[in-house]
């Protein structure tokens, strides 16, 4: 990880925890010394590098501030399960666990957790402040966030600078193949990329991946013209339901394809 990536992560987590502490103090009163209870709701499963970084970062920041907080951590595991029946069961579990002892603040990471909270908040976590992180396309939530006691840190990635670097390293590039899965996060990333390239002043042909299996994706990449590059965004679940961690995905694509691959997140680097 570069020093710039580390600094950005530190700033993001510090900002996130500062928002949490501020909201908790406003919500409970500065004179109340009772330890605050914080629920951390993750969109994905324990073991994903991004999820582990977020959770450990939250714990580390609260340890560093010396704030006396009780932290509960939950995982939606939405890369593996995301149907309505599953979410209804989660609702019942969380209602059982938190109805009598609700948290004072909720931190949610990534889009699926925020969507879950917006859907069930009125009946599950009424009026509890929510702080989000890792949201890819904040424009999707404009109506829901207005006057909602929900705030947070938006995830931004510099697509144009990544493409500029790619163009310098592969100056003959004419085609960019953008890889995303068809999950909520994947399609939010598509919207972000399309918005970013509107202002990109280099003439490139952008191709967006289909709803493919991993083998179909490899075949798509290998069929690209030689003057192409891959912009790897998020591909954690393929058309057949197979789930991929970041290391496994980048290793597979680098070994089985012959097109240069670029990414906007540091956890892809060094794995292929």
What are these regions (language model features)?
Residues 2-272:
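Short hydrophobic alpha-helices and adjacent helix-cap/hinge residues
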């Amino acid at each position: 990880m570069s020093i710039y990536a580390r600094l950005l992560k530190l700033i993001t987590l510090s900002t996130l925890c500062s928002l949490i502490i501020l909201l908790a103090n406003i919500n409970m009163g500065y004179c109340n010394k009772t330890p605050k209870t914080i629920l951390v709701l993750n969109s994905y499963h324990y073991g994903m590098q991004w999820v582990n970084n977020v959770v450990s970062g939250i714990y580390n920041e609260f340890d560093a501030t010396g704030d006396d907080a009780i932290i509960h951590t939950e995982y939606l595991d939405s890369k593996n399960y995301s149907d309505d029946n599953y979410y209804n069961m989660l609702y019942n579990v969380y209602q059982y666990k938190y109805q009598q002892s609700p948290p004072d603040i909720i931190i949610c990471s990534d889009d699926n957790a925020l969507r879950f909270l917006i859907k069930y908040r009125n009946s599950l976590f009424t009026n509890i402040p929510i702080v989000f992180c890792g949201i890819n396309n904040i424009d999707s939530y404009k109506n829901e966030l207005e006057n909602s006691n929900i705030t947070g840190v938006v995830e931004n990635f510099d697509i144009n600078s990544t493409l500029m670097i790619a163009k310098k390293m592969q100056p003959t590039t004419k085609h960019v193949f953008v890889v995303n899965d068809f999950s909520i996060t994947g399609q939010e990333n598509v919207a972000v990329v399309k918005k970013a390239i509107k202002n990109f002043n280099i003439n490139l042909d952008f191709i967006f991946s289909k709803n493919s299996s991993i083998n179909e994706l490899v075949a798509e990449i290998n069929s690209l013209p030689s003057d192409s590059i891959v912009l790897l965004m998020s591909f954690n679940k393929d058309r057949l339901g197979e789930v991929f961690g970041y290391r496994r995905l980048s290793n597979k694509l680098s070994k089985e394809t012959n097109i240069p691959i670029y990414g906007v997140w540091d956890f892809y680097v060094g794995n292929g």
